[in-house]
């Protein structure tokens, strides 16, 4: 414990020295003086002088004994009374808390009690949102400090680019178009519906018809989804979260993730949108719900999914007013996660056409989709999957093996009563033929499969 405490103190001392060098302070103890602005330093100096002067005066008065009326003249008595009365008035004044109103020397990395580390106050002063200061958010520099993960991303991008189908697109009115006419099942379906709230927040008239959640729910997604598939549904920042979950349930999907898009305003601080009449605060994020259909386990279905390659956050600059396009990073997240090659993008636009995807939307200006040509890309049994290389399999994050496979089962809990006494018997339970508690193919308390089905 002492060594740990010494290590923490040493790191704290080093941190203060580095801050002193960055701020140009003489020593680590003088950081506080550098953080204060000139006006604050002047106020502090005046306060110190005033308090020192009042202290000296009170000390002088306290040392001088109040003369009695018979021992001194009236002038001395009045002088002592005038010195004591202001001191009593100051004691009776209510305490006023100092309110911090300036963040001109806003600094990251300082103590949390320091007001200069107040991101909310900095937003009030400058208009810069707190998320503007999150580091390494771009695709290029996100994994600079993680060479293995950076190499994994590079290898996966190369494999995806080689296995992608040519970009195909179809101009269609999704209100009347039957999705079953695509004559294909899809592993991934991305929906980007033009919601009413997008146009309500921007205050600009819609160039295209916006969709209600009742209309979105009528889409025949369940008819084109594969036996194991994923759906990604952009549902805005407000009431769409609840309606989005309802859509997933209606289509036969289970909600498994919530990808959050955090919008920064580095290029245009202080920019405000038209406030949603249903909202109290400005909304600076959107949600993309991910649903799963079928049985997919990251520990056993490595041929179909690679989990934990990306994070569930997208941090990019907020688009201009009137632009409802979503960040392109959502495509990278989907392609890195799901190894299925049959990808469908609904409500796509000309700017979202990309290799490996079939884009369908009412605002597309052209079409090149042919159902027979598209189906020919997936004729062989393994052709619907991108596949995987040995190097990618070695680098990708995996589920830790169960304790029984690591040799912990039989030795756990072996105690004083011998190898077969106490809880040490838990690891041997699976070697027994049957026992009275083995009901419904579930193991009892002593088995390693408590609460789950026995492996097939």
From Swiss-Prot:
It is found in: Nucleus. Residues 39-74, 395-456 are annotated as: Disordered. The record marks 146, 242, 245, 298 as: Interaction with METTL3. Heterodimer; heterodimerizes with mettl3 to form an antiparallel heterodimer that constitutes an active methyltransferase. Component of the WMM complex, a N6-methyltransferase complex composed of a catalytic subcomplex, named MAC, and of an associated subcomplex, named MACOM. The MAC subcomplex is composed of mettl3 and mettl14. Residues 52-61 have a biased composition (Polar residues). The gene is mettl14. The METTL3-METTL14 heterodimer forms a N6-methyltransferase complex that methylates adenosine residues at the N(6) position of some mRNAs and regulates the circadian clock, differentiation of embryonic stem cells and cortical neurogenesis. In the heterodimer formed with mettl3, mettl14 constitutes the RNA-binding scaffold that recognizes the substrate rather than the catalytic core. N6-methyladenosine (m6A), which takes place at the 5'-[AG]GAC-3' consensus sites of some mRNAs, plays a role in mRNA stability and processing. Belongs to the MT-A70-like family. GO terms for cellular component: nucleus; RNA N6-methyladenosine methyltransferase complex. It comes from the Eukaryota. The lineage of its organism: Eukaryota, Metazoa, Chordata, Craniata, Vertebrata. This is N(6)-adenosine-methyltransferase non-catalytic subunit METTL14. It holds the Pfam family MT-A70. GO terms for biological process: forebrain radial glial cell differentiation; gliogenesis; mRNA destabilization; mRNA processing; mRNA splicing, via spliceosome; RNA methylation; spermatogenesis; stem cell population maintenance. The keyword Nucleus applies. Signal peptide: none annotated. Residues 39-51, 423-441 have a biased composition (Basic and acidic residues). Residues 410-421 have a biased composition (Gly residues). Keywords: Differentiation, Nucleus, RNA-binding, Spermatogenesis. It comes from Xenopus tropicalis. GO terms for molecular function: mRNA binding; mRNA m(6)A methyltransferase activity. PROSITE patterns: MT_A70, SAM_MTA70L_2. Residues 245-254, 297-298 are annotated as: Positively charged region required for RNA-binding. Residues 135-136, 237-238, 255-258, 278-287, 308-312 are annotated as: Interaction with METTL3. The keyword Nuclease does not apply. InterPro entries: METTL14-like, MT-A70-like.
């Amino acid at each position: 414990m002492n060594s740990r405490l010494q290590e923490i103190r040493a790191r704290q001392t080093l941190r203060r020295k580095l801050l002193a060098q960055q701020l140009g302070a003489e020593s680590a103890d003088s950081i506080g003086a550098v953080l204060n602005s000139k006006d604050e330093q002047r106020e502090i100096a005046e306060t110190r002088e005033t308090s020192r002067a009042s202290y000296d005066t009170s000390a002088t008065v306290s040392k001088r004994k109040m003369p009695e009326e018979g021992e001194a003249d009236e002038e001395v008595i009045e002088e002592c009374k005038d010195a004591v009365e202001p001191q009593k008035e100051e004691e009776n004044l209510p305490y006023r808390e100092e309110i911090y109103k300036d963040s001109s020397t806003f600094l990251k990395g300082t103590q949390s009690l320091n007001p200069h580390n107040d991101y909310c106050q900095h937003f009030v002063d400058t208009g810069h949102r707190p998320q503007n200061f999150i580091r390494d958010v771009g695709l290029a520099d996100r994994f600079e400090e993680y060479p293995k993960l950076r190499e994994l991303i590079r290898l996966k991008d190369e494999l995806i680019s080689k296995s992608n189908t040519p970009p195909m697109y179809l101009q269609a009115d999704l209100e009347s178009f039957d999705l079953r006419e695509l004559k294909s099942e899809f592993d991934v379906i991305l929906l980007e519906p033009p919601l009413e709230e997008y146009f309500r927040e921007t205050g600009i008239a819609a160039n295209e018809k916006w969709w209600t959640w009742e209309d979105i729910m009528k889409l025949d997604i369940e008819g084109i989804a594969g036996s194991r598939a994923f759906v990604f549904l952009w549902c805005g920042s407000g009431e769409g979260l609840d309606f989005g979950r309802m859509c997933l349930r209606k289509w036969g999907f289970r909600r498994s993730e919530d990808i959050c898009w955090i919008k920064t305003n580095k290029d245009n601080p202080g920019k405000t949108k038209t406030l949603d009449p249903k909202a109290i605060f400005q909304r600076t994020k959107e949600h993309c719900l991910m649903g799963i259909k079928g049985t997919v386990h990251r520990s056993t279905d490595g041929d179909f999914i690679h989990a934990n390659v990306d994070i569930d956050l997208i941090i990019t600059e907020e688009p201009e007013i009137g632009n409802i396009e979503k960040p392109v990073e959502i495509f990278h997240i989907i392609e890195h996660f799901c190894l299925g090659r049959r990808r469908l993008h609904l409500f796509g636009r000309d700017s979202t056409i990309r290799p490996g995807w079939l884009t369908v939307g009412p605002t597309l200006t052209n079409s090149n989709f042919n159902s027979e040509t598209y189906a020919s890309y997936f004729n062989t049994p393994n052709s619907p999957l991108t596949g995987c290389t040995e190097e990618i399999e070695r680098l990708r994050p995996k589920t830790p093996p169960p304790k029984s496979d690591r040799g912990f089962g039989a030795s756990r809990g072996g105690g004083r009563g011998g190898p077969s006494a106490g809880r040490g018997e838990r690891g041997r339970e699976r070697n027994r033929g049957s026992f009275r508690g083995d009901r419904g193919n579930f193991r009892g308390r002593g088995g390693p499969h408590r609460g789950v089905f026995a492996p097939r």
